[in-house]
Amino acid sequence: MIPGEVITPETDIELNVGRETLKVVVANLGDRPIQVGSHFHFYEANDALQFDREVAKGFRLNIAAGTAIRFEPGQSREVELVALAGKREVYGFAGRVMGRLYENVD
């Protein structure tokens, strides 16, 4: 093995298998393009983007890591979102959550 070498399997690597997904229609009502990255908590995206935010809470774009989707002014399109994993705690972004997404219900 060469230092830094990455050895991958011969088969395709599937991402987000078994994770909850949903589709939402998003419209850019602003006058500037808006770009949203792959791991941005979609619920907290730019306010000029119109979509059902409550449905998107706890989800991010279902696209490859390090990529983004650009919404042009006046554009409307359907995007697929995937549920956040791990502890399901969100900090930063627009500061609208700053903690657990949902309290555990027993």
UniProtKB/Swiss-Prot annotation:
Reaction catalysis annotation: urea + 2 H2O + H(+) = hydrogencarbonate + 2 NH4(+)
Main enzyme class: hydrolase
Lineage, opening ranks: Bacteria, Pseudomonadati, Pseudomonadota, Gammaproteobacteria, Moraxellales
Protein name: Urease subunit beta
A GO BP entry: urea catabolic process
Database matches in HAMAP family: Urease_beta (MF_01954)
Recorded GO MF terms: urease activity
Cellular-component GO terms for this entry: urease complex
InterPro entries: Urease_beta-like (IPR002019), Urease_betasu_sf (IPR036461), Urease_subunit (IPR050069)
Pfam families listed in its UniProt record: Urease_beta
Membership in a protein family: Belongs to the urease beta subunit family.
CDD domains (alphabetical): Urease_beta
